[in-house]
């Protein structure tokens, strides 16, 4: 105590005061409201514990735990449980109890079941974690995380987080819900979805539903030499299972395999993706690409494999289905090789219908 050194003590009433640990590793077993056991002593009316130095351990025996904040900031190595505020705590075993964030910006990191919260190594926490108020930051080292359909919620391999504002996926994948999700790409490997700002996103499986990607330019993708429907790459993020794409006047480019495009005026579909606000110039890329044009007229440009539709200028196109519409040549000398019924070749393009 302040003036005495007691030994052979079994029970201590701290009268709503504080307890300080040693410079070594201490263990504190919380046994009830404002009660704990440490160093063979049963303490009651404990208000605060400063665990001090060493790799200290707090065991809460299933009690709920909240991270701690003061003066507008989350405090590392600090938590609250059953009326006791712990500081300088390196390890916490919740024995199935719930972990919640503080009123300020907390940091969480997960790798499978391994969980760190405000620098505390947390074990045996319940799977549901409410990150609390503040702009909380979650770093996920799992290979995949999944949206739930509710804003600010994310399921990792072992935990279900809510009230999360910022997530670092550590170059891993994100999966959408079975319903319609929206992904706003904000920069290289970065996007916003479900009101969460994601960074270090390697790939996104938008999953089922009528999903939307908003970005400023995209390239269609292929796998093993075959173009993949509903797939694209933008800002170093590989998207799959995407139904809709808004390019905000950015460019669309084809893959290195045979892509399919269809236009009807400004309406554009590319590898089964409905594309809006694409820049007018579209390079179809490598492969024997197929373009279906529902406009009443399309026009050659004088360059091989190039065709202007009503709203787009395609290059690197090998095959065009004019859907029983018209083709117009250039102001110069063009050659048209008729190859069959309603079929011809011109400017390196095989036209049908």
List each language-model region with its residue ranges:
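Low-complexity/repetitive intrinsically disordered segments
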Residues: 1-22, 119-129, 135-139, 165, ...
């Amino acid at each position: 105590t302040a003036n005495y050194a007691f030994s052979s003590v079994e029970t201590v009433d701290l009268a709503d005061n504080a307890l300080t640990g040693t410079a070594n590793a201490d263990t504190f077993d919380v046994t009830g409201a404002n009660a704990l056991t440490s160093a063979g002593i049963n303490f009651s009316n404990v208000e605060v514990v400063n665990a001090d130095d060493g790799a200290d351990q707090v065991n809460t025996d299933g009690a709920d735990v909240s991270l701690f904040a003061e003066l507008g900031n989350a405090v590392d190595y600090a938590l609250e449980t059953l009326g006791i505020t712990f500081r300088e705590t390196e390890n916490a075993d919740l024995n199935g109890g719930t972990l919640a964030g503080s009123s300020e910006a907390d940091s969480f990191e997960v790798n499978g079941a391994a969980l760190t919260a405000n620098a505390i190594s947390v074990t045996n926490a319940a799977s549901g974690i409410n990150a609390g108020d503040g702009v909380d930051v979650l770093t996920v080292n799992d290979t995949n995380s999944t949206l739930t359909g509710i804003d600010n919620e994310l399921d990792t391999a072992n935990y279900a987080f809510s009230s999360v504002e910022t997530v670092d996926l550590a170059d891993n994948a994100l999966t959408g819900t079975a319903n319609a999700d929206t992904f706003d790409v904000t920069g290289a490997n970065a996007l916003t979805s479900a009101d969460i700002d994601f960074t270090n996103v390697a790939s996104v499986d938008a999953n089922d539903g009528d999903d939307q990607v908003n970005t400023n330019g995209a390239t269609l993708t292929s796998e093993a030499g075959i173009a993949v429907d509903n797939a694209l790459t933008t800002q170093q993020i590989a998207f799959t299972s995407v139904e809709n794409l808004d390019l905000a006047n950015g460019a669309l480019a084809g893959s290195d395999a045979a892509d399919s495009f269809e236009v009807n005026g400004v309406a554009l579909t590319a590898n089964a993706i409905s594309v809006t606000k694409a820049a007018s110039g579209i390079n179809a890329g490598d492969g024997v690409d197929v373009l279906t044009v529902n406009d009443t007229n399309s026009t050659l440009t004088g360059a091989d494999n190039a065709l202007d539709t009503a709203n787009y200028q395609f290059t690197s196109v090998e095959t065009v289905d004019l859907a029983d519409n018209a083709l117009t040549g250039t102001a110069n000398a063009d050659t048209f090789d008729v190859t069959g019924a309603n079929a011809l070749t011109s400017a390196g393009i095989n036209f049908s219908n």
